[in-house]
C-alpha cells in the first residue's frame, strides 16, 4: 500500500512539472489555436506508441474499458476545442477562473460514486489546492470585455467536461488491467477530433506554416502529452478527488518560477499565495 502511495505522487509530480513547463512556453507561438490543437493531438502519438510497447501491444479491446477510455479522451480534447470558442467571445480573465475550479466536479463525483474518502489532513490539502487554483486564475489585468453572453455556455461546457474527465479516467483505470490502454484510447480520441479543429480555423492548413515553428510547437506540446500519460498513472494509483486538484493547482507554480527566471516576472500577491498553498498541499498529500 505504501508503494502505491509513493507511485501516485511521483506520477503526479511528473505531470505537474511537464504541464508547468508546457504552460510557460505554450503561448510563445504565432500558430492559430486550432492548429496548436492539431500539433498537440499528433504529439500524443509517440506517447501512445511508447504505451503500446510497454504492454507489448496487448491493447485492452474489451468494450467497457475502450468506451470509458475514449470518453476520457473526448471529454479532454472536446473541452479544449470548446474553450477556443469561449475565448472567441470573452477574454481569458473571465473564462479561466470559471474553468479553473472544474476539479470540484471530480471531487463531488468521487465522493458520491467512487466512495473515496480522505483524512482531515487530506481535506485540508484539497482546500489548499482550490485556494491555489483560484489565486492563479485571478487576472493580472482586466482589459477587454465579453462580446456576448454565449461565452458562459461554452465555459460551462468546458467546466463540466474537464470536471467529469478525471472521474471517468478513474472508472476507466478500474476497468482495465493496465493504464497504458487508457492512454492509447485517449490519444485516438484526440486524433479523431483533428478534422473538427481544422474546421474551426480560417482555412489555412497546417502545412502552410513554417516547419521551424511547427517543430518548436511540437516539442512544447509533447510535454503536455507526457503529463497526460503520467496523469493516467497517478489517477490509477491515487484517488481522483486528490489527483485532479493537485495537478491543476501545482503546475502554475512551475510556470511562475520559469517566468521569474527567464522574464524577471515578479509574481503578484495572489500568485504568491497560490504558490504557498500549492506547495503546502503537495507536502500534505505526500503524507496522505
Task: Give the location of each predicted region.
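Specific alpha-helical transmembrane segments that line the substrate/conduction pathway
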Residues: 88-114, 240-260
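Hydrophobic/small/kink-forming positions within alpha-helical transmembrane segments
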Residues: 16-20, 24, 73, 77-81, ...
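Juxtamembrane helix-loop boundary signature in multi-pass membrane transporters
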Residues: 1-13, 101-160, 269, 275-288
